[in-house]
């Protein structure tokens, strides 16, 4: 139980780090810009994550029945599906989010909402966040909370430390870089872990 709570707390830190760091080390105008872009990327993330709804119970059943062949097949298909949907959705987001924000904030002159570099990094970070879904789902289905809690804690610490270091110099882009590094780390760590302990999946 406590290992699951630790993972949940680390997840909350990953979710709220950007706004807190921007509030402390940057300005409220940066928080305002971040919130507008976050509105779009969160919507796309919810769309991608909905594709994998209900898969944890199926994977858990296959693990419990020790149906290794079916587990590997289902996981491979889920992984391919999520990767494809995430890349397509966030590729479109990278291309269209700035024009959308320009229309959404038309008439606002006190803040420059056109932040193309930030849009690129935050979209890429959220793409990697979605790509880790199959790994996260199969880990939870297998009940490997204790074995994987260090991954969540390290990712949260990476996000905090890198964001603080880079936000002072790069502002909005800095927190997006911190988030991106944290999720890239999680993807690599989780992919390596499940390939060794849960599914037969080359990594």
Where are these predicted regions, by residue range?
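Interhelical loop/hinge segments that connect adjacent transmembrane helices in multipass membrane
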Residues: 1-16, 54, 58, 63-73, ...
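Alpha-helical transmembrane segments of polytopic membrane transporters and translocases
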Residues: 2-3, 18-19, 32-49, 77-84, ...
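Interfacial/gating helices of multi-pass transporter permease domains
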Residues: 22-42, 70, 74, 111-116, ...
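Helix-loop junctions and terminal segments of transmembrane helices
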Residues: 41-79, 135-141
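Interfacial transmembrane-helix starts/ends
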Residues: 67-84, 88-96, 115-119
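Interfacial segments at transmembrane-helix termini and the short loops linking adjacent helices
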Residues: 93-126, 173
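Membrane-interface junctions at transmembrane-helix termini in multi-pass inner-membrane proteins
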Residues: 123-154, 194-196
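C-terminal transmembrane helix end/exit motif
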Residues: 138, 180-203
């Amino acid at each position: 139980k406590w290992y699951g709570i630790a993972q949940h707390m680390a997840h909350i830190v990953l979710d709220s780090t950007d706004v807190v760091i921007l509030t402390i080390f940057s300005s409220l105008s940066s928080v305002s810009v971040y919130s507008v872009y976050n509105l779009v990327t969160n919507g796309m993330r919810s769309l991608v994550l909905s594709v994998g709804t209900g898969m944890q119970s199926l994977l858990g059943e296959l693990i419990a029945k020790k149906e290794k062949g079916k587990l590997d097949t289902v996981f491979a298909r889920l992984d391919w599906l999520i990767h494809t949907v995430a890349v397509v959705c966030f590729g479109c987001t990278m291309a269209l989010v700035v024009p959308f924000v320009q229309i959404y904030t038309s008439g606002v002159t006190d803040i420059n909402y056109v932040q193309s570099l930030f849009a690129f990094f935050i979209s890429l970070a959220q793409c990697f966040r979605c790509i880790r879904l199959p790994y996260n789902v199969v880990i939870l289905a297998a009940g490997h909370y204790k074995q994987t809690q260090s991954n969540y804690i390290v990712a949260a610490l990476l996000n905090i430390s890198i964001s603080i270091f880079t936000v002072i110099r790069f502002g909005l882009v800095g927190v997006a870089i911190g988030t991106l590094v944290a999720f890239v780390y999680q993807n690599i760590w989780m992919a390596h872990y499940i390939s060794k302990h849960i599914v037969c999946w080359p990594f």
